[in-house]
Amino acid sequence: MQSFSLEKIEEKLKNVKLLVIGDCILDRYFVGEVNRISPEAPVPVFDLKETYFSLGGAANVAANLRGLKVKVELMGVVGRDEHGKILKDLAKKEGIGIKGILEEDSRPTTIKTRVIAQSQQLLRIDKEERKPISKNLEKKFQEIYEEILQEVDGVILSDYAKGMFLSESFCAWIVKEAKRKEKFLMVDPKSVEWKKYEGATSITPNYKEFKETAFKENLSQDNLKESAKILVEKYNLDFLVITLGKDGIFSYHPKEGAIYSPSQAKEVYDVSGAGDTVIASLGAFYAIGLPLKQILELANIAAGIVVGKIGTKPVYWEEIKNFIKENFKEKE
């Protein structure tokens, strides 16, 4: 870990404002116990003890930014339904700006329900509509996006392939408009079609997504540095970040070359939402001008903390600060 002042970082984070635009998801948890088998069929009987909701997808990216003391506006689509109302209420409770969350009558709010017993996930139930947003909604988003862009330092595009960016022309416009306004834009991709992300500051695939893109582009799936270099040049990126799960984070920057940061996870209970934490950390620490190596180290620490939590939960700056003080000697 490099020498840096935690107090200085915290002070700077409080002055940052970012926009998260993407697929908003509501996560619901059924928590209980399994102690017997059903007499009706050879399946376990789940005794429900608790139900709770949390922010997922792009909304979880926004929640992580709030945990890092960054001011946030969130843009995305929900259904005109009870789950959409719950998502917006949760976002407001976290201090997330929601003027960019629009409703669409023809689609339900995306909700993922996880059934958990004895700290283990037994089942996940998804309710979603995977279709592009309407042209009318696109137009409304464009108007709000141009307005919010003037207020923020940068943009995080969180693509979960649920509808926001299934229109390649709309996605490309989002990226180009940020560049035109000289705002950085980082992408957490779902698609292997990176043309729509061209010109972004960075793209942050996980290893599986990187391999799929490399395969499509006829590049080596094993030589990270060589393939990353080609992708950075082809898609006009400032740099590329690849998350490697338990193996940490890899980055390629044309001037700084390849940078590898090992994982800082102590215990892994649940990896859901870890990618959201990484992209939020990259955006927050990039916005305050930290060097890329230090940004990756902090993102790794943040990811290592959230995988030790059960369920989709954000990281908090205090947790990162405590981890560093316990595991590294901080030099002021």
Question: PLM features: residue spans?
Answer:
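Short acidic, glycine-rich surface-loop motifs adjacent to enzyme active sites
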Residues: V152-F165
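Positively charged, low-complexity intrinsically disordered leader regions
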Residues: M1-N35
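Substrate-binding N-lobe of the ribokinase-like
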Residues: Q2-E10, P39, V43-I111, F323-K325
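Structural motif
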Residues: L19-I21, R124, D153-I156, M186, ...
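A short, aliphatic-rich alpha-helical micro-motif
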Residues: L13, L149-Q150, W194-E198
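Conserved phosphate/ATP/ADP-binding segment of small-molecule kinases
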Residues: K162-A258
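Conserved phosphate-binding/catalytic loop of the ribokinase/pfkB sugar-kinase fold
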Residues: I101-R107, R114-E151
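Conserved post-catalytic alpha-helical subdomain immediately downstream of the catalytic base
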Residues: D238, Q264-N327
